[in-house]
Design a protein with these regions (language model features):
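N-terminal active-site segment of His-dependent metallophosphoesterases
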Residues: 17-75
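Bacterial N-terminal signal peptides
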Residues: 9-17
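Extended active-site neighborhood of metal-dependent phosphoesterases/phosphodiesterases
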Residues: 69-156
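Bacterial N-terminal signal peptides that target proteins for export
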Residues: 1-8
Length: 156
């Protein structure tokens, strides 16, 4: 993430964080990211999530290392759906945010995945989810990086 993207996120968070957050004390919010490489560590993380007390899990991006081109792409099964199956079977909500690696394919595939799996939530690349007075943002900053470099190249 570049400095400009970080400043935008911090600005948004500073506006949102003015009011103290009162969250449900019984809720446990869990976060994972860059989970697209199939290896023993990924399996341990998925198992831990499946056996956890998480109220929800938010995937912060890079769902697969190579991106996926379609709903039928073997990479989707091999790198995400099959390894995450033990967790998906728990019914704990999984909120997806796409990352730069997901743009190596077609990131809109995850919109279709969310329709096929009731526990996966991904209505768009930018969305919010509120739990009481606590609000989480899904901010796909990859598009801003691409626009930044596009315009930077055009001005040289």
């Amino acid at each position: 993430m570049n400095a400009k993207s970080l400043k935008i996120i911090l600005l948004i968070l500073s506006v949102v964080a003015i009011k103290p957050i009162i969250a449900d004390e019984s809720s446990i919010y869990c976060f994972v990211g860059d989970a697209g490489e199939v290896n023993p560590t990924q399996a341990k993380v998925v198992k831990a999530l499946a056996n956890s007390d998480c109220s929800m899990v938010w995937h912060l991006g890079d769902i697969t290392q190579l991106g996926v081109k379609s709903i039928d792409d073997p990479e989707l099964q091999d790198s995400f759906l099959t390894p995450f199956k033990p967790f998906l079977e728990t019914g704990i909500p999984l909120y997806l945010t796409v990352g730069n690696h997901d743009y190596k394919g077609d990131p809109s595939v995850y919109l279709k995945v969310a329709k096929d799996y009731p526990s996966i939530f991904h209505p768009s690349n930018f969305y919010t989810k509120t739990f009481g007075e606590l609000c989480f943002f899904a901010l796909d900053t990859t598009i801003f990086d691409k626009l930044y470099y596009f315009y930077k190249r055009g001005n040289q």
